[in-house]
């Protein structure tokens, strides 16, 4: 059963400006500890695109849940990792999911400077209704 669909588009130059003003603060605000480890391994030239994709992905996932960031789910509740082939894998904190039935999140990310886009689909094998 389809729970929800969400999408988000982010202008990478917007993230570049934020990084220029707040080089460490912004990453720490939106990334989980697992994501910060990946971020630290990147060269600075890739920081803005990485953060833009994570920002867009988390917004898309929250929209697919039907709530949006800051409306019941936060940036730190969602972790975006990649499998060995580069496919994005979404982990959602038990703080948010403990009342939900099992679900799968499908996420697609793309970037072509100056924009990146994220598209998320959440499905469940159970009949559930979210707020």
Curated annotation (Swiss-Prot):
Coiled-coil parts of chain: none
First-listed, main subcellular location of the protein, grouped into a coarse class: cytoplasm
Entry-linked SUPFAM superfamilies: 4'-phosphopantetheinyl transferase
Names of the cofactor(s): Mg(2+)
EC number: 2.7.8.7
Domain of life the protein comes from: Bacteria
Pfam family, one: ACPS
Reactions catalysed according to its record: apo-[ACP] + CoA = holo-[ACP] + adenosine 3',5'-bisphosphate + H(+)
GO-annotated biological processes: fatty acid biosynthetic process
Keyword Iron-sulfur annotated: no
Annotated localization: Cytoplasm
HAMAP family (alphabetical): AcpS (MF_00101)
Family: Belongs to the P-Pant transferase superfamily. AcpS family.
Function: Transfers the 4'-phosphopantetheine moiety from coenzyme A to a Ser of acyl-carrier-protein.
NCBIfam families linked to this entry: acpS, pantethn_trn
Protein name: Holo-[acyl-carrier-protein] synthase
